[in-house]
């Protein structure tokens, strides 16, 4: 099973829910080797520990969750099996990191987003290609694809060597409001999962993409642990609501304000 719930291993929330770290997919299967050319893996530079997923959005920029940030980190692109390196796999380091100028932290969970500029651009190859930002907002009821190297079992964790993928449904925001009483009223979050449970993002899926109808619509952010509980969907950052900010940063306007 694909567990992609995000448990930030450096945070302990004093809330009724736990944040999913950058982690895995429960209830899924190994991803097709050709379906995740945009999926990247974030590692801690000193310990070489896998931290989170991320998404390559052009040759020089990666989008991930803010809670995945570490002072020293590197990024693997074109990776499938953690222990087997493709000829075209690339490694890059963050040159610049961008968060919202109006927020010094990401305790407001709808702002759990980080834009990373790579120290050198990457070229498209057999296992590397960017995923475009969404042109339209997602629709409730859409079938979405979630993926990552997060744990595939919960609460006892099993971290796989290969990414797992699973299909989940984009649910009405009220479903997550019922599951998480302290959830912000904001609509810049997406609610996605399977009401019956059994399929979910989980620990160390954080930062990875949620793809709905072929468009990059969400970033794995947080959820309840153990993962994949009935009527407790996962929370994802709504990428569409941040496209103007992302495009402004990429264009060089680093003083741009975040959305209200």
From Swiss-Prot:
Transmembrane segments: none annotated. Keywords: Disulfide bond, Glycoprotein, Hemostasis impairing toxin, Hydrolase, Protease, Secreted, Serine protease, Signal, Toxin, Zymogen. The active site is at residues 67, 112, 206. Snake venom serine protease that may act in the hemostasis system of the prey. Pfam families: Trypsin. SMART domains: Tryp_SPc. It is found in: Secreted. Belongs to the peptidase S1 family. Snake venom subfamily. GO terms for molecular function: serine-type endopeptidase activity; toxin activity. Monomer. Its EC number is 3.4.21.-. InterPro entries: Peptidase_S1_PA, Peptidase_S1_PA_chymotrypsin, Peptidase_S1A, Trypsin_dom, TRYPSIN_HIS. Expressed by the venom gland. This is Snake venom serine protease salmobin. Residues 19-24 form a propeptide. Disulfide bonds join 31-165, 52-68, 102-258, 144-212, 176-191, 202-227. GO terms for biological process: proteolysis. GO terms for cellular component: extracellular region; secretory granule.
């Amino acid at each position: 099973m694909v567990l992609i719930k995000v448990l930030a291993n450096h945070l302990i929330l004093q809330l009724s829910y736990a944040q999913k770290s950058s982690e895995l997919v429960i209830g899924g299967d190994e991803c097709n080797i050709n379906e995740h050319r945009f999926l990247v893996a974030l590692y801690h530079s000193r310990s070489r520990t896998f931290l989170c997923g991320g998404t390559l959005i052009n040759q020089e920029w990666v989008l991930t969750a803010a809670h995945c940030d570490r002072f020293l980190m590197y990024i693997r692109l074109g990776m499938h099996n953690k222990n087997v390196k493709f000829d075209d796999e690339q490694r890059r380091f963050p040159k610049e990191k961008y968060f919202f100028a109006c927020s010094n932290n990401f305790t407001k969970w709808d702002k759990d987003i980080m834009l990373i500029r790579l120290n050198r651009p990457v070229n498209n190859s057999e296992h590397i290609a960017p995923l475009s930002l969404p042109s339209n907002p997602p629709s409730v009821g859409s079938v979405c694809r979630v993926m990552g190297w997060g744990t595939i079992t919960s609460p006892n964790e099993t971290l796989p060597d290969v990414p797992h993928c699973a299909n989940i449904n984009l649910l009405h925001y009220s479903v997550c409001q019922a599951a998480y009483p302290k959830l912000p009223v904001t609509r810049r979050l997406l609610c996605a999962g399977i009401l019956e449970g059994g399929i979910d993002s989980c620990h160390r899926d954080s930062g990875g993409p949620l793809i709905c109808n072929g468009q990059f619509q969400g970033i794995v952010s947080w959820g309840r642990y153990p993962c994949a509980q009935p009527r407790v969907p996962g929370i994802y950052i709504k990428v569409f609501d941040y496209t103007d900010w992302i495009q402004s940063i990429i264009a060089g306007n680093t003083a741009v304000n975040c959305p209200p």
